[in-house]
């Protein structure tokens, strides 16, 4: 067992690499910002948004997964930084047994996938809000809770599926690194994550366009128009979040897959330099509450601006009649 945890010369160089330490420090900083931004995002969603209850349930679940991921990942990063500064001479204490890392890795895979599943869940919830004739009260709570339960089950299962038959009889540099014998399955996981993220993005864009076309059909029905505006604002937010998630997930999956496929043809130093910057999951976790805050603020500002414009606009009776005629045409 002692031999397994002894670092090779390449692994020692990676531990000593300034690039590696900078990347880990940046990731650690993102975790602290994620915690603070999440508190602000939760308060804003509760007090300043017009999201349905079902949307709020899934947004909060996504925030939970983002923070849980950052907590577990930051523990791993702190261990790495400690070893870099205080244990570099202890060569046979640098690596960690894969079996010891399994609970951490399952949590990291599960929570990173959970953020993606939450986006899919939000998309399904938006379809319900769009196509169900009545979508309010207890129905929104039921839909949101049901989707959240499905997301949680899927999240718990994903981490176990990726490494379920791996003997975990080797050692790794850090717990966020996939076991060596799960290389093929990790690549499949990357591809599936990219496809799901792309699907989320495409479907949310299509749904957003559909909702905007329907808004004109109910422009003279106040309650119906408010509900449709509520649906549009929520869908626009989900679309915006899906786009950002897709960009980072594409960098993560395509970058890792490409580097793994050419690993035998490039220098270890080159591989180690780039692979740490392809690990963008911490940035997915960070940008979710950040962009959620931005969307709630910007949407609220637009609503306030429209109210001011309406209150400041003075029309004659003829102008009002002409405007009504144009709207009916």
Curated annotation (Swiss-Prot):
Q: What is the lineage of its organism?
A: Eukaryota, Metazoa, Ecdysozoa, Nematoda, Chromadorea
Family per similarity comment: Belongs to the nematode receptor-like protein sra family.
In which domain of life is the source organism classified? Eukaryota
Keywords from UniProt, A to Z, are:
Membrane, Transmembrane, Transmembrane helix
State which gene encodes it: sra-8
Q: What membrane topology is annotated for this entry?
A: Multi-pass membrane protein
Under InterPro entries, the record lists: 7TM_GPCR_serpentine_rcpt_Sra, Nematode_rcpt-like_serp_alpha
Q: What is its main location?
A: membrane
Organism from which the protein derives: Caenorhabditis elegans
Under which name does UniProt file this protein? Answer: Serpentine receptor class alpha-8
Q: Name one GO biological process term.
A: detection of chemical stimulus involved in sensory perception
Keyword field contains Magnesium: no
Query: Mind telling me which PANTHER family this protein's record contains?
Result: SERPENTINE RECEPTOR CLASS ALPHA-1-RELATED, SERPENTINE RECEPTOR CLASS ALPHA-10
Question: Where located?
Answer: Membrane
Q: Where are the transmembrane segments?
A: 26-46, 60-80, 141-161, 187-207, 231-251, 273-293
- Cellular component GO terms, alphabetically? membrane
Q: Entry's Pfam families?
A: 7TM_GPCR_Sra
């Amino acid at each position: 067992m002692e031999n397994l945890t002894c670092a090779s010369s390449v692994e020692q160089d990676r531990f000593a690499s300034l690039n590696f330490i900078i990347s880990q420090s940046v990731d650690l900083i993102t975790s602290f910002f994620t915690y603070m931004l999440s508190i602000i995002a939760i308060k804003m969603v509760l007090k300043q948004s017009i999201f349905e209850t079902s949307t709020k349930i899934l947004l909060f679940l996504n925030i939970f997964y983002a923070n849980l991921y950052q907590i577990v990942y930051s523990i791993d990063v702190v261990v790495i930084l400690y070893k870099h500064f205080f244990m570099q001479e202890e060569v046979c204490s640098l690596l960690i047994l894969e079996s010891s890392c399994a609970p951490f890795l399952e949590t990291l895979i599960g929570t990173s996938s959970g953020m993606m599943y939450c986006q899919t869940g939000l998309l399904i919830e938006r379809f319900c809000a769009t196509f169900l004739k009545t979508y309010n009260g207890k129905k929104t709570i039921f839909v949101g809770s049901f989707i959240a339960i499905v997301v949680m089950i899927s999240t718990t299962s994903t981490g176990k599926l990726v490494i379920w038959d791996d003997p975990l009889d080797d050692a790794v540099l850090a717990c966020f690194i996939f076991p060596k014998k799960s290389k093929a399955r990790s690549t499949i996981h990357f591809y599936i994550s990219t496809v799901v993220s792309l699907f989320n993005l495409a479907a949310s864009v299509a749904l957003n366009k559909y909702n905007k076309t329907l808004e004109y059909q109910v422009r003279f029905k106040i309650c119906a128009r408010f509900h449709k505006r509520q649906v549009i604002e929520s869908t626009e937010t989900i679309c915006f979040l899906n786009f950002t998630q897709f960009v980072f997930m594409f960098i993560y999956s395509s970058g890792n897959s490409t580097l793994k496929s050419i690993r035998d043809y490039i220098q270890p130093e080159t591989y180690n330099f780039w692979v740490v910057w392809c690990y963008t999951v911490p940035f997915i976790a960070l940008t979710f509450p950040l962009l959620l805050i931005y969307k709630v603020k910007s949407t609220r500002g637009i609503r306030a601006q429209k109210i001011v414009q309406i209150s400041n606009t003075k029309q004659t009776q003829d102008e009002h009649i002409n405007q009504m005629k144009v709207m009916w045409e």
